[in-house]
Amino acid sequence: MKINVNGEEKRIELDQENARLSTALNHMGYKPNTIIVELNNLIINSMKWEKVKLKDGDNLEIVSIVGGG
């Protein structure tokens, strides 16, 4: 499956039928407690990541939350 992540095309080895957002994020090494995810211009609540299916060509924007002071 090909998806665009932060403007870069990525190929992820996921079965199209079972390609969930949570699985893709885990596969790419993202930690769920430290990111905000936008899928095709919509912010996706982390409580829904398990239910959201990805499709070939989807656009993800992933923003990491960093603390500081």
Segments (PLM) and residue ranges:
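Ubiquitin-like/PB1-type beta-grasp interaction modules and other compact soluble beta-rich domains
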Residues: 1-68
